[in-house]
Amino acid sequence: MTKKFLSVCVYCGSSSGINPVYADAAKELGRALVKHHLSLVYGGGHVGLMGIVADAVLDAGGEVTGVIPKALMDTEVGHERLTRLLVVKDMHERKALMAEHADGFIAMPGGIGTLEELFETLTWAQLGFHEKPIGLLNVAGFYDPLIEFLRHQTSQGFLRAEHKDLLLMETEPDPLIAELKTFTMPKGVSWLSRQRAQTLGP
């Protein structure tokens, strides 16, 4: 990447899951971010994997920016120890601001909200709205069914292989962070760039 890589937005669950391995992985990711001199951007909550990864970064001396809608802040799920907590009006503004403050993205295990954030970020990359790296931390095979489904979409002609490959996948934080740091968006991958090329011609 030509731009300095200084911060990572982490998408993950507001619950911890039933397997302790997920919480352990969140702690490991938080410590790895600090080790690689990266700040954390996330959804601003103190609960679930969200809170665990934020606490791990803070406990290791790192910086954390949280972005949380006022409605969630009012229910007292906002984290009180963050370096910076931005309170926004709704979920749309939350996602936009998280993306604006991050140089890359990592999705950990989570629920519908985590998947929605991940796929919106991938869609933005596919369309050419950003060229930031997107990683999937596949803890204990959690995302194996999703990875297989993406392959199925590709085999059935609904997802281009180069768009599937925009999602960097690893099982450990360190190699995933290394991939994010060295990622460069391939030329001609974005849908908009292809449309412009077809319109303008050679």
Cite the ranges covered by each PLM segment:
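Active-site/ligand-binding-proximal alpha/beta "capping" segment
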Residues: 93-128, 135, 187-192
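Gly/Pro- and small hydrophobic-enriched strand-loop and loop-to-helix capping segments
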Residues: 63-65, 127-140
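A cross-family phosphate/adenosyl-ligand binding-site feature
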Residues: 1-101, 140-174, 179, 184-202
